[in-house]
Structure formats: structure tokens, C-alpha cells
């Protein structure tokens, strides 16, 4: 049944690249076969509950601009928000959604009331999922908005906050399992510091490692079959976050013996904040074997902060999905639109239009990436560039069969005096442009 929030808008359909209908897909065709697989199954789109239905449209210099009928902290409002959300998922044809606990339930006066409220809304979501066929890509706990978390959650100097945070994550993992979630995400928005003057770095990292081990242990205890994901971000809201980027997360996982247990959820905007490209972080995750899922958005390159805009750059998407596909594609993960409207975008249609544009952009990027892989457009030049490493002597060096002094003797014996080979960057950039 329609809530009326979106008026008489019908389900969004694919109309092809010549369509000028703003409420239609021009490139995203769920059933189109790309690289032997349905486009919908490649991309696994999800809608972010927080930015789409909870964000009030504020910024550091101004408050709420959006007027939503569910903007009250009551269970009745939470259920109305759920009604609108699942109507939105159905109109858009999004197969998945994601949420924080605080996005979906009213705030209680204590932990027990929060848990009661979450359990009630989980039951409501379960029925909505059954009615619509929409699934949960991942759940997570908001351990950063409430003032109790201002000095961190797992890394807080107060063990009571650590305990409260651990208990909250337990209930959110239970909720995620109940709803059949494919993943559980940890984002350490307050797990970092503002100044080292009041920070015991070693202690906080040990606390964070213990916390993550507790999460993994509980995953096995309850039989949760999804993937545990960490979402890297270098800063904002803290000056420095401990999960700075993919490489930092991998070092942290190795230190705590969790590199086989936890993967990463990579957000494009966070990669940019860390001084990386999106494809850099995806390639690093593949290299370390910890790629899990992506949060799709973009930052304004001039602003210098996390603007969470919908993607609109096809070449960027092509290179991103190239690395997703090169790593074997999504398994439990997907493409979550961690994107929000601009605060002047007041019309309910804007929610649909933003997602439609983002989905079309991703679809174009996916098709370009799949074609590049099919043609070997980048992989063939790459194989040629490293071909000499396949020689017997090179393989001996790589396998550790030659000691340093033996390598030195080999260079002297064979009078090895290498000349540089061309990198062909301009050629490869032109190749990519042919596909997009």
C-alpha cells in the first residue's frame, strides 16, 4: 500500500539510453547480461537508511531543511519511516538496504529500552522484507552520534563506554542475523583522537583489537554466516582515525590475528579523504585478500570534506568496477549508496532521481569494466610489463631460493646492466577512454 509520500510515481523502469524521463533508468537494466551474469547480480545495489530517510539536511552552518512526516523520536514515526523506506526500495527496484540501529529505532532512556525498541522494529522489518522481497545487505551500530561516544566507543578511556558499546554491537549483530543480513559493518567514527596530549595510543589500539576479537567470537557463537567488515576512513569526525585506509586496516588485522576473519567495506569518499583514488583502495584490498563491499558516493574535490554525493563520473566507476570484477566480484558484499541529497533538494522525487542517476552511472562503469576485462585491454599490457618475472631465475629470487650474495654474484657473472622499459601510461589512459 502506498504511503502517499511519493505521490503517484510508478515503479522505476529501464527505458534505454535515449530516454529523457528523469524517473527512468537509461543504462541500468537489471536483467541485462554483462560478463555472463545479470547486471543486478553484479552490482547488488543497496540504499542507505541513514542518509536517505534520517538525514535532516543540515550542515555546519545551518540546521534542518527537510520536512519529513517521520521526523519524531517515537515508535510510530519509526514505523512510518519504515513504510516509506520499503516503498522507496520497491519503487527503485533496489534489492538491498543497510542501516544503523539509531536510524531505525527511537532512542531509549537506557540500553534495555534501546534493545526493546530495536527488537520491535526488527520484527516490523522482517514482515516488510517478506512482503517486498528486499534483503538486508548489512547492519551496523551507531557508536558515534550520542555524546557518550565523544571520546570513542571501543577506544574510550572509560571501560563502561567500552562495555555499553560491546553490548550495543551484540544486539545489532543479533538484529542483522535475524533479518538475514549478508554482512555486519564496523565503522570507527570516534575511534581515533583529537590530540595525542590526552591519548594513550598503545592502550587504545589494544582496546580496539580486543573489541574486534569479541565481535568475531560472537559471530561464530551465534552462527552468523555473513562477513564482518571494517570501513576505513582517515578523519572526520576525529582528527585521526585508527582505520585510516585499507593498508592501515590490514596491518591492524594482522597484529590482532584477524586478517582471515575480517574484510573491508570501502567508501569512495573516504578513499579521497585519505589521499587515494577509489581504485587504489580497491586494488589494495584485492592484493591483501580482504575486499568485501563498497559504499558508493563521491566527494567534492575542492571542499576537502566528506560531502557524500551521488556518483556521476563514469570513468571513475569503470576503473572501480574493473578492480571489483578483477578480484572476482562481490560475494557477500554489494554497492551501497552512502550518498545524500544536497540540502536544497527538497522534493521527494529528488530521492529517487539521485539514486537513479547513481545507478545509471554505476551500470555504465560496470559495462565498460566488463568489456575491458573481456578484451584483456589492461591485463595484456600488464602481463607483458611483468613477463620477465616468469623466467626461472626471477622465480628463484621470488621464492627465496637465492640469497642476497647469490643474487649479487649472478649480477656480476652475467654482467646484468638493465635498461628501463616504457610504462606506457598515456597509451593505457587512452585505452580506458575508448571504453567509457
Curated annotation (Swiss-Prot):
Keywords on record: Carbohydrate metabolism, Cytoplasm, Isomerase, Magnesium, Metal-binding, Xylose metabolism
Disulfide-linked positions: none
Species this chain originates from: Agrobacterium fabrum (strain C58 / ATCC 33970) (Agrobacterium tumefaciens (strain C58))
Active-site positions on this chain: 100, 103
One GO process term, biological-process aspect: D-xylose metabolic process
Catalytic activity: alpha-D-xylose = alpha-D-xylulofuranose
CC terms in the record's Gene Ontology section: cytoplasm
Record-given protein name: Xylose isomerase
Lineage: Bacteria, Pseudomonadati, Pseudomonadota, Alphaproteobacteria, Hyphomicrobiales
Binding-site positions, Mg(2+) 1: 231, 267, 295, 338
Record's cofactor remark: Binds 2 magnesium ions per subunit.
Compartment(s) of residence: Cytoplasm
Cross-referenced InterPro entries: Xyl_isomerase-like_sf, Xyl_isomerase-like_TIM-brl, Xylose_isom_bac, Xylose_isomerase
GO MF term set: magnesium ion binding; xylose isomerase activity
Main location: cytoplasm
